[in-house]
Swiss-Prot record:
Name of the protein this chain belongs to: Cytochrome b6
Topology in the lipid bilayer: Multi-pass membrane protein
GO molecular function, one term: oxidoreductase activity
One Gene Ontology term from the biological process aspect of the record: photosynthesis
Phylogenetic lineage: Eukaryota, Viridiplantae, Streptophyta, Embryophyta, Tracheophyta
Cofactor(s) the protein requires to work: heme b; heme c
Length: 215
C-alpha cells in the first residue's frame, strides 16, 4: 500500500496539498456562525445526490409528472426517504444561505479586498432561490402549476419586453408542457452547472483572502 501511495506522492505531491489544507490559519474570532456557508454547501451536495436518484423515476411531462412523484413516494425503494431528504435539505439550504448572507454583511465580509467574493456569493444566492422556484413546479400538482403561472406572469408588467419575456419563460403563450420542460432543464442541468462554476470561483477566493476580521 505504501508503494502505491509513494507512486502518487511522487507525481502529485499529495502531502504538500494536505499540509496546505490543514495548516491554514483560522482567526480566533471565528465562531459557529462562520460555518453557515459550509452548511449551505453540504445541503447542496445532498440536493445533488438525492436529486440525481430521483431522475431515475421522475417523468417531466404534464401527464406523468405527478404520478411519477407518487410512485417515488409509495413504490420506489426508499423513494419516500430520498424525496423527503431532498425537500428538507432544500429548505435548509435556503435558510442557511439567507443566514450566511446576513452574517457576511453584518461582519463586513463584503468590503475590500473581498468584493468579488461577495459578488459571486450574491449570484449563488440568486441561483439558490432559482432552484426553489423551478423545483417547486416539478411535481406539477395544483400548488406547483399555479406557482409557475404566477411567477412566470410577473414580468408581464414590464413595458415593451414584458410579454416576450413571459413567453420565453413559459415556452409558449400559456403554461404547459413547454414550461415544465424548461423548468426541469433549468433545475437539473443549467442551475447546477452555473452553481458549480460560481462555487469554483467563490471558494478559491475565500481560500486566497482568508476569513475577514472582526468589526
Amino acid at each position: 500500500m505504501s508503494k502505491v501511495y509513494d507512486w502518487f506522492e511522487e507525481r502529485l505531491e499529495i502531502q504538500a496539498i494536505a499540509d496546505d489544507i490543514t495548516s491554514k490559519y483560522v482567526p480566533p474570532h471565528v465562531n459557529i456562525f462562520y460555518c453557515l456557508g459550509g452548511i449551505t454547501l453540504t445541503c447542496f451536495l445532498v440536493q445533488v445526490a438525492t436529486g440525481f436518484a430521483m431522475t431515475f423515476y421522475y417523468r417531466p411531462t404534464v401527464t406523468e409528472a405527478f404520478s411519477s412523484v407518487q410512485y417515488i413516494m409509495t413504490e420506489a425503494n426508499f423513494g419516500w426517504l430520498i424525496r423527503s431528504v431532498h425537500r428538507w435539505s432544500a429548505s435548509m439550504m435556503v435558510l442557511m444561505m439567507i443566514l450566511h448572507v446576513f452574517r457576511v454583511y453584518l461582519t463586513g465580509g463584503f468590503k475590500k479586498p473581498r468584493e468579488l467574493t461577495w459578488v459571486t456569493g450574491v449570484v449563488l444566492a440568486v441561483l439558490t432561490a432559482s432552484f426553489g422556484v423551478t423545483g417547486y413546479s416539478l411535481p406539477w400538482d395544483q400548488i406547483g402549476y399555479w406557482a409557475v403561472k404566477i411567477v412566470t406572469g410577473v414580468p408581464d408588467a414590464i413595458p415593451v419586453i414584458g410579454s416576450p419575456l413571459v413567453e420565453l419563460l413559459r415556452g409558449s403563450a400559456s403554461v404547459g408542457q413547454s414550461t415544465l420542460t424548461r423548468f426541469y432543464s433549468l433545475h437539473t442541468f443549467v442551475l447546477p452547472l452555473l452553481t458549480a462554476v460560481f462555487m469554483l470561483m467563490h471558494f478559491p477566493m475565500i481560500r486566497k483572502q482568508g476569513i475577514s476580521g472582526p468589526l
